């Protein structure tokens, strides 16, 4: 404990984490592909007194979160295992966009995934958020939740009128990754032989279940000569995106690779990295898979599965937006680099690293990046993102008319491929 520090539970918690645990975690930061201990040590020291001065747990968490945010990378975070302050995209399966309304700013619901709490409560794209639990929320304040709670949101509907939407938030299976999974895959046939495959996320580390969902979605679009893959609002997940990428090309193609700091400094040839090129069909094989990769260096090369020719090959459009992140960006970058699809929408955020969550004591969890990700052509998407070949935003006025301008643009592009 720090000399002279109080022995109250909160003071003990504050002293324990900043001095002992956060200092120990400089070793974990050493695996970060972008920054190292030389950066983290002085920064921790400079913020220490601010952290120790916090009188309440919420302020303490906010200060440590601010410290971790100085890394300026994705897959960072600091929170309590009680799962407070979970962002809307993870808690209610919905994203928001800041728009101008009557001389001010409001959050507009943008991607509202089927099967998620927001969708089940009747919230739809274009609705405006007015308050949460009676407290007004405006940009730049983010909409966050505590999992398991019942929440009342005041909504201004797209077509006018105000209502209260009552959401019941489930308790996620994982405390380390508190994400409420919506229906991950939706498929439908649009006009002109265009199939639509919407993938909201890639749940699961290996992604056996979502891979099967993608299989069923593609099978239901049999006969379509053109395909739109809608990745808007896809916040990522595990390696299940490999199945989607494998449907975009007939053979086996290198996608990209994770790269730890240790491997980068030691030197490497990307062709010699350990390969991952098949999502198993049965969960019984997960034990074998875990044993195979448990003791290898965590720099892994991803290769498509070789699923054969599809009628829509060469006629694919990928829809992305500013919420398409992580594994969603991996899919988009692969399609772009190999000329497998035309990218339509808005620029992605550039949040693509391999991360892990570490328990640091007193119920707190620290999220840190542990490996970088590079495409096969050597691009790092972190903090860069993907710029669509065809730019198209989402219009609330068009939504009011029953039109999704981004989907309309994607369909028009698909017809001319």
Predicted segments with their positions:
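PDZ/PDZ-like domain segments forming the peptide/carboxylate-binding groove
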Residues: 85-139, 196, 210
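Conserved PDZ fold ligand-binding element
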Residues: 25, 118-140, 228-230, 335, ...
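Cleft-lining beta-strand/loop regions that shape enzyme active-site pockets
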Residues: 6, 148-150, 154-361, 399, ...
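Low-complexity, Gly/Ser/Thr/Pro-rich intrinsically disordered linker/tail segments
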Residues: 388-417
């Amino acid at each position: 404990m720090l000399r002279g520090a109080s022995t109250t539970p909160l003071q003990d918690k504050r002293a324990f984490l900043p001095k002992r645990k956060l200092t120990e975690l400089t070793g974990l930061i050493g695996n970060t592909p972008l920054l190292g201990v030389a950066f983290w040590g002085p920064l921790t020291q400079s913020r220490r007194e601010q952290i120790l001065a916090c009188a309440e747990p919420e302020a303490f968490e906010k200060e440590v979160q601010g410290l971790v945010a100085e890394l300026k990378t994705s897959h960072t975070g600091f929170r309590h295992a009680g799962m407070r302050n979970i962002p809307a995209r993870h808690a209610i399966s919905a994203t928001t966009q800041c728009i101008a309304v009557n001389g001010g700013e409001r959050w507009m619901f943008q991607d509202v995934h089927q099967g998620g709490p927001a969708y089940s409560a009747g919230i739809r794209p274009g609705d405006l958020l007015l308050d949460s639990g009676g407290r007004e929320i405006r940009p730049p304040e983010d909409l966050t939740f505590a999992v398991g709670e019942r929440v009342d949101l005041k909504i201004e509907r797209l077509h006018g009128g105000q209502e209260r939407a009552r959401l019941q938030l489930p308790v996620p299976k994982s405390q380390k990754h508190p994400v409420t999974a919506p229906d991950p895959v939706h498929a439908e046939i649009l006009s002109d032989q265009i199939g639509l495959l919407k993938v909201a996320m890639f749940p699961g580390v290996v992604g056996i279940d979502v891979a099967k969902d993608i299989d069923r979605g593609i099978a239901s679009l049999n006969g379509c000569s053109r395909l739109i893959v809608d990745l808007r609002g896809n916040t990522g997940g595990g390696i299940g995106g490999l199945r989607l990428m494998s449907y975009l090309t007939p053979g086996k193609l290198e996608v990209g690779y994770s790269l730890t700091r240790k491997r980068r400094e030691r030197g490497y040839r990307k062709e010699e990295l350990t390969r991952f090129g098949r999502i198993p069909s049965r969960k019984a094989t997960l034990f074998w898979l875990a044993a195979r990769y448990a003791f290898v260096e965590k720099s892994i090369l991803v290769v498509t599965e070789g699923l054969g020719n599809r009628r829509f090959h060469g006629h694919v459009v990928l829809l992305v937006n500013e919420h398409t992140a992580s594994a969603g960006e991996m899919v988009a970058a692969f399609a772009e680099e190999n000329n497998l699809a035309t990218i339509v929408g808005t620029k992605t955020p550039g949040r693509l690293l391999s991360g892990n969550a570490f328990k640091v004591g007193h119920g707190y969890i620290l999220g840190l990046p542990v490996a970088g990700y590079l495409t096969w052509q050597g691009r790092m998407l972190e903090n860069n993102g993907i710029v669509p070949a065809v730019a198209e935003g989402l219009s609330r006025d068009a939504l009011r008319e029953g039109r999704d301008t981004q989907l309309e643009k994607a369909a028009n592009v698909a017809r001319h491929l």
